[in-house]
From Swiss-Prot:
NCBIfam families: cinA_nterm, molyb_syn, PncC_domain, PRK00549.1. This is CinA-like protein. PANTHER family: NICOTINAMIDE-NUCLEOTIDE AMIDOHYDROLASE PNCC, NMN AMIDOHYDROLASE-LIKE PROTEIN YFAY. CDD domains: cinA. Pfam families: CinA, CinA_KH, MoCF_biosynth. Belongs to the CinA family.
Amino acid sequence: MRCEILSVGTELLLGDILNTNAQYLSRRLADLGIPVYFHTTVGDNPERLKKALEIAFSRSDMVIATGGLGPTQDDLTKEISAEFFNKKLVLHEESLKRIKEFFERRGLNLTEGNIKQAYIIEGSRVIPNDWGTAPGIILEEGGKILILLPGPPKEMIPMFETYVVPYLSTFSSGIIYSKVLRVCGIGESFMEEKVKDLIKSQTNPTIAPYAKEGEAILRITARAKSKEEAEKMIEGVVKEIRKRLGDYIYGEGETSLEEVVVNLLLEKGLTISVAESCTGGLISARLVNVPGVSKVFKGSIIAYDNEVKIKELNVPEEIFKEYGAVSSQCAMKMAEGIAKKMGTDVGLSATGIAGPEGGTLEKPIGLVYIGLYIRGEMSYKELRLSGDRNRIRLYTTINGLDLLRRGLLNL
């Protein structure tokens, strides 16, 4: 069965909203063994929406459309879909009852637009919406399947999981299962070179490399009759990849670099503080994304000005005179200074030239030094980054966390 995901909403075309629904649905459909062949995005325009449906059903057996089920005049997915299949819209009394109760519980007045949401395509089955007002629809017609779901992810995802997944499970023959390995410290091309022969030789499982900002990803995917069988197929491939990439692999699945770092600190019973210059708090922000970080993270100082580095971090003035603020010597002293000031086992620092001004031939834009202090031992990493200011700061943050990870692994 060929499936197509149709995302409806002018806001998606304008880039005002990130299309996370399509990403989510593609992943889940793959888990169910239903291949997605096309993604289409169309605005809230009746003619273009109808054309999108025509194209979708000319090449796909099933179309899952999200968005355009709301109460406003430009929410037309249901109406255009009914027109496409030459069907009428009919009032679904149970949905109307649920919508009325939804508004009564909140002390709100029901509008004509909300009543419109209770209409469904003739001959379709309703997908109840226990998280909002717009019910979904499943329509089987002429060997084709149309599934309509609301656009808000907080409604779409639970509706899909609760009601659509059981329906779709009857169509899947086997499953597609993937495992993701997350890599840091090497670029996508270098990583791919390390496993190039595996990528070429593997057909099931397959190995696909992807680039992510400052990181790289390897997705290993197997098609099998069951999840257990797929996991066994993947296991040997993952073992060989780990053998080749070693500690460049920092995690699996949705694990973030900062989660790995915080878990290492917790495991080793260490505390950390951070001194930041060019990153301006980005490293600290990433750390505090992790629940439970308060057990290991004591605080940070944004020491942008040299005077702050001297007074707050105890960086000797001679460092600036002899080496400058952007130097390995300064980075290490910043890391040592913050650790001693905060009374932590570990200190991490970053100093560099993020641009667009301030670079010289000797010290160009993108030159960054990351300092690491762990219980009296100091080390550093030099980076020569390219791109705009935001990219340099982001890559510095990622490399800083990775240097910290490696330092902790070596303890």
